[in-house]
């Protein structure tokens, strides 16, 4: 017997181009996991592909094959034990050879692979491990040619990508480069053991009154020899053991223990309670000797997707522990094109930003990867709900028998790997594949329920989303809701706003509607929508090396924006709304204002609709992050620098948010007439679970003078509806013949004497306003070792006051509207005494 030992094979690797034959061609690999682009850079064979036009200089890598090699000593293996070579991820077509003998062939990036090498390592001394990585780009093209009858309809990247189980964004997307990586992208190690815990998971039954829970822990055991193994289960909370139980392992290698938990501490998304995590541990024992120990954290909670008929159609919203949750959040793409470079610390910083921005859900998009454990651990610990796509995106995938088998293994592996995470509340079959079906005119008869028929149509991928994947989720994570696609709703068109989720791209893409009416364009759950903006100047300084290229329409800036038609779309939204500028810094700022306003108009209205029989169940903006330094829809750039939209969204997602908006008049139509009157509305949105009392004030302030143009409106002792919307004014009227000068509507709400939220509605568009000479004052009123407080005041209304984003500095608020008589405080952490003050900019400055 032997206790499980692990020997990571992270050092001592070398690699070379497969076409090279000389020994001199081998180059050292600093550390594994890695991909070839990282290793080429480390050997000065490749420039940073994220800078300038270097992506083009890296294109040769995409069509190459590579070999990785290491030499290792056979680990000591006591009698009765085995030696296993374990790969957590190989990217992608990999032939693994041990001492010249092929022991494994891999064609799926998303699968872990294990090979028993006990006999292969019988000889003492050195052993040579080689991995040949074939070119995925060329293999995909070969596979496509083998099936010319399949309709290879797709958006983004070469359509041949659909034949390969590799991160689809590697073929390039409308926000990322074409970087076809290859390599040992997750850990590789040797394991020596006589028996091991192959899997540990829990199933939780929470009583309806939440006063008790039943936790059943399951274990699967692999052993070299059958025998009297015992599983010692322990249940802990905050490091303190609650209970334990010892169970004999059955002949088929399973054991389970059931624990009754009284008055359990529930797992909640942040803002609703503590994200409490229990820990279950199992010690595998034989003859009083511990052979292997595994621990996993889990949460006690319920999670449902509520779909029920109502006056708007059919609802789609999330309920956790019996509480309806408005899921304001973001979509997530891989945080780097070179995946092994993402550290656990970097993952956690991203999720901390989500919490700082009051976002409660993150959608792991289907064109990337099933994320690293540290991503989900951070979501568990910080209370962020996860919408998890399976890795299919924007295409009509083929369904060859061997590909279906690979997909089944991939889905089983990843559902089993991730099922203990309480943050994951939904599995979704794909991203926009049903939209591809619609646009390509592929066959989809929702009434045909025979899966074998689906395989015979020109849209065979339906079999994956409506049979294979739901069966896997039902078998391995039966308590998690499954949704066939995003967007999708009961087989109706994907743009149907009455059912399921929808991707609303008629702002930016599509009909390019005015962002001021975004709230009228939504559906039951808006799982994608967005607006592009430039990143901050410091990010552009990173990838634009030549000062002469730092102007808005430069070649290199266009190259770093992969969105089709971005020039026309950015220009359209800028010229419709703002006084444009030709200098780069102002141009950056103006695009950020447009993005912030777009997100605000969408989120604000959709959150208000939550209170109307859950008309809108949530909004996940496209997108939170970037995979390289670029110009995109991200609200936080590659270097974790928030754009103004990040703060605009955070304010709208405040637990208590006041909203005010006037009727939108479109000045761009033919023969537009100035309105004589405009309607306005005032409301409060609350995610609090109890009714509260508040005082709401609405002021009407001249843009030109800062003075009140009419008597303010005050609602005292207002009863704020719990977890919903309280409409205070639905038929307000502005008489432009009486109050002709442009003015803002400035709303505030106090609860228990504390000012908790603000909103300012402006005359649209901004380009018609004179925003000069604001009388803004930003004054430091306190300072400590790493924190400063600023007091901001103004004589006239100020639009979108944005502070500089600096490395290691966190700002409590930015992209703020400031009005006279309402001084605001901003806390800055990480700025030390003597540091230069943060620069700031506002509209019209």
UniProtKB/Swiss-Prot annotation:
Q: Which Pfam families did the record assign?
A: Glyco_hydro_2 (PF00703), Glyco_hydro_2_N2 (PF22666), Mannosidase_ig (PF17786)
Keywords (alphabetical) are: Carbohydrate metabolism, Glycoprotein, Glycosidase, Hydrolase, Polysaccharide degradation
GO MF term set? beta-mannosidase activity
The reaction(s) this protein catalyses: Hydrolysis of terminal, non-reducing beta-D-mannose residues in beta-D-mannosides
State what this protein does: Exoglycosidase that cleaves the single beta-linked mannose residue from the non-reducing end of beta-mannosidic oligosaccharides of various complexity and length. Prefers mannobiose over mannotriose and has no activity against polymeric mannan. Is also severely restricted by galactosyl substitutions at the +1 subsite.
* Entry similarity comment: Belongs to the glycosyl hydrolase 2 family. Beta-mannosidase B subfamily.
Q: What else is known?
A: In contrast to clade A beta-mannosidases, which are likely secreted, clade B proteins appear to be intracellular.
Spell out the PANTHER family in the cross-references. BETA-MANNOSIDASE (PTHR43730:SF1)
What name does the UniProt record give this protein? Beta-mannosidase B
Chain's gene name: mndB
